[in-house]
């Protein structure tokens, strides 16, 4: 096998640039889904059930995209066609979802419309997101993978900065942040429109700038039979042959993604309770809290961007991973005890450290362990299960846990903190990868 060539910084940048737009869409979804469905009339104890759809679509779509793209060799590339189709569908659905309450439908009908829109949005975002991870695995050598995934993490978090702050920014510019009962405010609707436009522009940029290898070049650099990926291999067989690192990192992922599922689900209700002292979803205070969630997630992304730049400086990647999760766990744990909206920025900066590590480090560990394996795209799609399954489990248990902690959404932040610390403990089973 010939060593993969070192790529210039800008080639590494171009591989992941479209992730910036995809992450804007993902940020708008993660910051506003609880707000949207609560505004439509969902009960807080049932709110987590709406969050089952995003990871469920991920666990179904991403392995399929990985498997199909392993077998795809066309004039437009191997991974790029899936990226472009997913982004196009996402743009269309982003124009529909925030209007779920604007078509004069009954509450139940609006909920169903919102759920169907959310299902298609999740499907398309996952379809657009997975190719970026596979492009790095395909074209970047071991020595540069940490840098490549750190760039991806930087772009991902930069996209989050933009997506999270949109509703707050539009409200500041005079766009209405209140609406009749059951209707989503214009500040949220316009945010989705602008996010959709940026998404398609970013994906077009990556499509034009990235030239994937042909089958012969891929085989030359990846020590894999170009026909091997075309042979059928069921997922059970692949999982049985998966490297040990796949499962060890997966255990860490279990705790981490469950923690962040509770953050996305309950942050709006938490700060509405602790800062604005309201649980009325039709009140101006609740909608202000919804905007401030975006601001806090903005600062979380700032923390992630800064920490992502620091992560490559650590010589011991295992230590960096565990440290990041502990810092994030502390951030979660102190959220319920802060009643000032400005001071809440601090714990979300800390939470951003964990997020940066979660985006960059698991895939660096796993893609290094997959060197020489056929069906690499399928493996990365299956590894996405370590992101999706924990979220599904957390969403299914969310209402029950909320009852256990006194029906105060703020207490779910403490639960999230404990989960991250458990994830840090699980890092002990991981070995640091060998660098070329």
Region roles according to the model:
Residues 43-53, 186, 277-301, 411:
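Loop-to-transmembrane helix entry
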Residues 127-140, 357-372:
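Intracellular juxtamembrane helix-capping segments at the cytosolic ends
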Residues 318-362:
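C-terminal transmembrane helical hairpin of 12-TM major facilitator-type secondary transporters
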